[in-house]
């Protein structure tokens, strides 16, 4: 969970530093009607179309493949140029152009998808006569406190 917070904080900080709010002229040189000299314009070349910088898109950018071939259909993708954060149930993938950081708890992805989801099991079942008979077969220790000795 700490890794998720670190990725989110990193994403927010990088987004703040790359936004137009952080690129300001030195004090006393701000003129809203004055145009910048051509030598101060920065040209950025991108290999993919840039969306609106003030809008965060949910989904996969058009230049990335939409299917990884693994059985992880439920994933969340946050895309703010030029960064993409893909959050999947068992891994977090952060893609930055020129740098790839992958944090994964499952080193081998699941290749065989189950046909259906396993049935849900209730966690608050009070042991009754049937459950008490099954406990010795399941090799689960059963502790019984006897308060009759006083």
Swiss-Prot record:
Signal sequence residues: 1-22
Key words of the record: Detoxification, Secreted, Signal
Domain of life: Eukaryota
Pfam family for this entry, one: PROL5-SMR
Compartment list: Secreted
Biological process, per Gene Ontology: response to toxic substance
Database matches in InterPro entries: SMR-like
GO cellular component labels: extracellular region
Function: May play a role in protection or detoxification.
Protein's UniProt name: Submaxillary gland androgen-regulated protein 2, isoform alpha
Source organism (scientific name): Mus musculus (Mouse)
Lineage: Eukaryota, Metazoa, Chordata, Craniata, Vertebrata
Gene name, Swiss-Prot/TrEMBL: Smr2
């Amino acid at each position: 969970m700490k890794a998720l917070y670190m990725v989110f904080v990193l994403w927010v900080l990088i987004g703040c530093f790359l936004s137009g709010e952080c690129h300001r002229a030195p004090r006393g040189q701000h003129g809203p009607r004055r145009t910048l000299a051509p030598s101060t314009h920065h040209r950025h070349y991108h290999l993919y179309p840039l969306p609106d910088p003030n809008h965060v898109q949910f989904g996969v950018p058009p230049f990335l493949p939409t299917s990884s071939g693994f059985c992880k259909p439920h994933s969340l993708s946050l895309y703010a140029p030029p960064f993409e954060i893909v959050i999947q149930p068992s891994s977090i993938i952060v893609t930055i152009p020129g740098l790839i950081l992958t944090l994964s708890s499952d080193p081998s992805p699941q290749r065989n998808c189950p046909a259906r989801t396993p049935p849900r099991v209730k966690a608050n079942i009070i042991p009754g006569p049937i459950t008490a008979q099954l406990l010795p077969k399941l090799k689960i220790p059963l502790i019984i406190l006897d308060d009759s000795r006083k």
